[in-house]
Amino acid sequence: QQVEETKGSDIATEEKEVVEEVPDDGKFHGKWIVDAEYAIGRIGAEDTLFVDSRGEKQAIMGTIQGAVATVWQDWAIQEGKAGDENWGCILEPEALAEKLGSLGITKDKEIILLGETANGWGDDSRLLWELLAAGYTDVKMVDGGLNAMKEAGAATQFLASNPQPAEVTIDKIDYTHVMTTEELQKNYDDYKIVDVRTDDEYNGAILYDEAQGGHLPGAIHIRYTDLFQEDGTLKPNKELVQMFEEAGLSKDDAIVAYCTGGIRSSYMQLVLEMCGFENSYNYDQSFWRW
């Protein structure tokens, strides 16, 4: 895997202009985020597929009408155990294409991902992050996740729907927003590191069979849960940008987000990017490997 060069200054300027034009209405606005009302309007549409990132076991207790279910682990290399070389990295193009095809997740459909947001680990964002890397463009997450849709009156069902398999081709994986262990070790001082785990994890607790406790040297601590309001929806753009800047981040920085296995940190990376911190990366192997 190689980390590609960052975007040009023209794109960065463009991003900043977009952020400045965001409505100040108490909601988050971003190209990969839709609200529950929009998502409800897409239920039953032939060109839209809902994907429940909590997996089939959770979908048994209720999911959105027509949704298929999957888990991030099935989209990642799982050879060996957590912390082993390549464990948790994005599948190679052919293997990922086969997995997505088996779920009917094709590039000609609008893909809307569902998760548990603040109460989960960002499973929906990890899938979206991988779809972007695989060349998908019409992909979105629901702000507030499944709960927001249920509260807004979405039609639900017990059990996930049976997928309609289709042919999927992925030419390559785009590593623009992927950080590797090798690159981070080689050029550590070039990056600002953001640890998105809980206070206990940051301060040394070993909760998920990590090889050691603590955090990466000099890591800034911005909890994954700090992204959300009490109802599980994202905080407004302006509030998030202020939080990032007060933590010591600048839109000119190269920023690496990490957690335990690159799940919660994928949400952080996507939100950073949508807020104009374009030069941001998700370290998919994260603390398990480090």
PLM regions and their residue ranges:
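Solvent-exposed loop/turn segments at secondary-structure junctions
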Residues: 55-58, 73-77, 117-121, 146-149, ...
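Thiolate-centered catalytic microenvironments shared by cysteine-dependent enzyme domains
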Residues: 23-25, 90-183, 264-281, 285-286
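Helix-loop module immediately N-terminal to the HCX5R catalytic loop
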Residues: 79-107, 224-255
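Flexible, polar/low-complexity N-terminal or interdomain linker segments that lie immediately upstream
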Residues: 3-61, 146-210
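N-terminal carbohydrate-binding/catalytic regions of secreted carbohydrate-active enzymes
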Residues: 48-102
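A mid-sequence, solvent-exposed acidic-amphipathic segment
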Residues: 193-216, 220-233
